[in-house]
């Protein structure tokens, strides 16, 4: 069987595509995305709409292989057709002005013609059925709903039908045993951000949880967040599976932010963020709590601006330990795919980046920080080469003094201890980088960048091991890559 979201009002029907699935035309909706990677520190008001553009999407539910026919209405079918992730190996035919292909795996896909502008999201979801609506605390059936800020309590559940469009956001504090599931969409466009802090309750984003445990989030789509999209502050035992984060464009819209938490898994999810995609942070309020035991796997990640798989920049915690990013496709890495920014006091160790596939495209333009009202994005003719790995420990509080920090976070690790902002026992292995012909000609194998910097003389970096880096299928040696080190012992970084 297959089905699809059919919202009951005229919500952004696409003028760029017609889509047919197994011979049936289905509705194609639109969402807003960033037009180019141009971000800034919160200026007191939201990002201008003229820095954005529309993308299209279809939201499918299926348990069978699907034949998909896409008819482009604003671009030529004769252009360069890309179906991502490339690792899926989807073969494309062109028939009668249509792009024809099949998909059988659940997950998020992206169709691009020539570049990323005017792309099409294709979400193929596993069916999630609510057998008894009477047993669900908050049931959103077919239709459009306006709950505003949905405040959950312990043992609450939320179900979102595939035909439900919910204008609102989710909040919980000191709660446990919560389940949020379904194939519909939460849209946070009704929320206005009015202040700087991302850590506080003032602005919610799609989901914000404080001091919660035993949480399940399955299958739901989240769009148009006012700030960080999915927020977990000091949470324990959280399972996130097969969610879709998309249509994000506002300032600081990170995808998933996990703060001083433990026992977290994120699987089979699609995360397209404007800012960082997945990041693990530590902040003063919870600086006594380490970040431990986290697994991010089988995900499709797309970061417009910032970092993709990130530790930091805020690392106010005793330790980061046993954190794994594994078997993920990175459609766009922002400026860095695998990132450790130990900007505070934590000892970061036993972190693994494994079996990641990083796509570099010559139409990805450089990330720029907007510093004034008059500044425009003027780097549309340049190429951004995202770093495969970056490890550094520049001081967060020095870089962001405007936040008013006056001291280092409380921690068992004092300044001057070799563990303070230290990094050790890091594995980066089996990283498969794809680059297009333009990048290959201009940069060669030097498009693969490893950057390891220690800015604190009393701090130790050691046992950072990189093994199995491939470019377009060819394994690279250390001399093939652009390897940059500063302030680290010669044996701190080993490339195998």
Model-predicted segments: where are they?
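Extracellular beta-rich repeat passengers
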Residues: 336-496
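Beta-strand-enriched, solvent-exposed domains that form extended recognition/catalytic surfaces
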Residues: 2-134
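Right-handed parallel beta-helix
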Residues: 155-157, 162, 176-187, 213-224, ...
